[in-house]
């Protein structure tokens, strides 16, 4: 077994509080708390505020990344957390995000990244068919034979 390379969580939060989703400082502090709670190391932070509302905030982590996209008019927040290694706990980060955004409904999807299973799983599974190549070769031979007779 080769093992798992990373954990990727996608979190959809529905029915969040409108005013918090357009507050850059609030979302930034929430993310910083989630990073800390998840035992992750912040390397860089960037955000963009859309007009008339909405945010995209990205945290570059030593272990991966965290992104938050807010849609205030829909009371919706989309979060991605990708981590590698065993020291981080992205599931702990979700608790902080839930406490802050207070969604009415949440959907979390866990994706195992890089889980290839065994070395044989990594080999490409390509089905080769010689029939098309044989047809090209046979057709070429027929054309060549035909052209040779014409002279």
Explain the meaning of each model-derived region:
Residues 1-67, 71-151:
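Polybasic/polar functional segments that serve as interface/processing modules
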């Amino acid at each position: 077994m080769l093992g798992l390379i990373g954990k990727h969580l996608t979190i959809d939060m529905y029915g969040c509080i409108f005013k918090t989703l357009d507050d850059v400082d609030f979302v930034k502090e929430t993310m910083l708390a989630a990073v800390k709670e998840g035992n992750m190391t912040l390397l860089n932070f960037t955000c963009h505020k859309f007009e008339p509302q909405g945010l995209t905030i990205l945290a570059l982590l030593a272990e991966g990344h965290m992104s938050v996209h807010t849609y205030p008019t829909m009371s919706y927040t989309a979060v991605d957390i990708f981590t590698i290694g065993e020291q981080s706990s992205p599931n702990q980060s979700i608790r902080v995000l839930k406490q802050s955004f207070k969604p009415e409904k949440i959907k979390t999807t866990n994706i195992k990244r890089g889980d290839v299973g065994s070395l044989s799983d990594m080999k490409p599974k390509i089905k080769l068919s010689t029939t098309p190549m044989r047809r090209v070769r046979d057709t070429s031979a027929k054309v060549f034979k035909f052209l040779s007779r014409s002279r």
